[in-house]
Structure formats: structure tokens, C-alpha cells
Swiss-Prot record:
Coiled coil: none annotated. Homodimer. This is Kynurenine formamidase. Disruption phenotype: Cells exhibit slow growth in the absence of nicotinate. Belongs to the kynurenine formamidase family. Catalyzes the hydrolysis of N-formyl-L-kynurenine to L-kynurenine, the second step in the kynurenine pathway of tryptophan degradation. Kynurenine may be further oxidized to nicotinic acid, NAD(H) and NADP(H). Required for elimination of toxic metabolites. Pathway: Amino-acid degradation; L-tryptophan degradation via kynurenine pathway; L-kynurenine from L-tryptophan: step 2/2.
Length: 261
């Protein structure tokens, strides 16, 4: 897999695989940036996962008020977390600069939602101690208006309690153990609260009742922590298909469009 990735692009962050579903125009008010999932390691999940959903949003956007992009990142085991997170952050930052984007809406599915959650927790480290990638996360928080977390993974502890067999992919992304995942909700919620408040970011949680790979346990775990800190969020539960149907679902597209326009 790693040889295939390197052959595709000399850019290790794969920026040249960024997809444009809807280009910026003079009427653009909102930018949507998609981050695909795939358990950190599945090459079958790509930026093109969101093609159908993005085209549905484009068909609704009769006044061309939205632009839409989807970014790529390297996979495990070639690299481990947080390096793949940093790939995503680097590519989003570059896209924002090249296109002059403001009013960002980040949409992540599965591990893509995990990445967004990790970005929201960026304030866990003092700014003077932040790495370049962490400073980029801080910069993104300043222009992100909404996040849409679709059937996401938020707590690796809860994930492996419910699905011990998922260790087959978590150990690829976290070879030194899931304790290296620093964004367990119960641990970072004070910093997420600070970010949501300071930067006025709206959080949307979406989950399909028919998801065969993730039950509601992940979403409910996150909701419990959000409620403990009395944080505002919106929840959309529906039959949105199987896990890999969610990012194609027309009802999800309408939910996103209705909440950004």
C-alpha cells in the first residue's frame, strides 16, 4: 500500500488528490470540506466517497452560495496517528490559503469525524508549546463555523470495549497502544468547550440507526460528555443506511445544506 501511495504523488500529504466538487464563485458564502473515513487504513475510502452527497448539495444550491472540496491523507500502517491527522490538517490549511476560504464547514465520516474531533481538542496544549501542525489546527478553529460528525469514532477505549476485534486496525494507527490517543472525550472536553465557545463553532452529530459497524455507543458516549459540560449541539438520528452509505445519503446532504444556508 505504501509503495502505491508514493507512486501516486511526490507530495507526501497528497494535496494534489484534493477533489473539487463545487468551485468557489462570487456568490460563495460557505465552504464545505470533507474528510473521508476508512479506519485509518482502508484504501477503498477516498476523497471521492463524498461525490454523490456533494452533487446533491450542489443541485440544491441554486444560487451557488457553497463551494465544496474533499481532501486526502496518508494511511496506516505507512504512518501512524497523529501523522495522518496532520496530513489532513496540512491539506485543509493549504486549500484554505490557496482558495481564500472563510466560513468553513468541516464534514467528517467515521475516522474523518475523529480527525475533526481531534482538531476541536487542539487547545489542550498551550499555544507556546504547539507544533506547526497544532498551530495550523488553531488557525482552522478560527475560521470553522460548523462541524458535521457522521457516524464517528470518538473514544477508542469505548470502541475496543464494544468491539475488541477492531484492535486489528487501531493497532495499525496506534502501534504503541490506544493510550497514545490523547483526545478521549472525558479527558479533553474542557478544551473542546473552550474552542466551541471562543470560536463560536456549531457541532452537529449524525448517526444512522442502520450502521452495521458502529452502534450508537460512540455517539452516546460523546453526547454524555457534552451534556456533562452543558455544551450545545445538534443531533440527527435516522435510518441513513449502512456505515458506508451515510456519506452518500440524500437526507444527510439536505441536513448539511439546510444548516449552512
Amino acid at each position: 500500500m505504501s509503495n502505491t501511495v508514493r507512486a501516486i504523488s511526490p507530495d507526501i500529504t497528497l494535496f494534489n488528490k484534493t477533489l473539487t466538487f463545487q468551485e468557489i464563485s462570487q456568490n460563495t458564502r460557505e465552504a464545505v470540506i470533507y474528510i473521508h473515513g476508512g479506519a485509518w487504513n482502508d484504501p477503498e475510502n477516498t476523497p471521492n466517497d463524498f461525490n454523490q452527497l456533494a452533487n446533491t448539495i450542489k443541485s440544491m444550491d441554486t444560487e451557488s452560495t457553497v463551494c465544496q472540496y474533499s481532501i486526502e491523507y496518508r494511511l496506516s500502517p505507512e504512518i501512524t496517528n497523529p501523522r495522518n491527522l496532520y496530513d489532513a490538517v496540512s491539506n485543509i490549511t493549504r486549500l484554505v490559503k490557496e482558495k481564500g476560504l472563510t466560513n468553513i464547514n468541516m464534514v467528517g465520516h467515521s475516522v474523518g469525524a475523529t480527525f475533526i474531533w481531534q482538531i476541536l481538542a487542539a487547545l489542550k496544549d498551550p499555544q507556546e508549546k504547539m507544533s506547526e501542525a497544532q498551530l495550523q489546527m488553531l488557525g482552522l478553529l478560527q475560521i470553522v463555523k460548523r462541524v458535521f460528525l457522521l457516524d464517528g469514532i470518538y473514544s477508542l477505549k469505548e470502541l475496543l470495549v464494544e468491539y475488541p476485534e477492531y484492535d486489528c486496525f487501531t493497532r495499525l494507527a496506534f502501534p504503541d497502544g490506544i493510550q497514545m490517543y490523547e483526545e478521549e472525550p472525558s479527558r479533553v472536553m474542557p478544551y473542546v468547550k473552550k474552542a466551541l465557545s471562543r470560536f463560536s463553532i456549531d457541532m452537529h452529530l449524525v448517526h444512522s440507526y442502520s450502521d452495521e459497524l458502529l452502534t450508537l455507543r460512540q455517539t452516546n458516549c460523546l453526547i454524555s460528555c457534552l451534556q456533562d459540560y452543558q455544551l450545545s449541539f445538534k443531533l440527527y438520528l435516522d435510518d441513513l443506511g449502512l456505515h458506508n452509505d451515510v456519506y452518500k445519503n440524500g437526507k444527510v446532504a439536505k441536513y448539511i445544506f439546510d444548516n449552512i444556508c
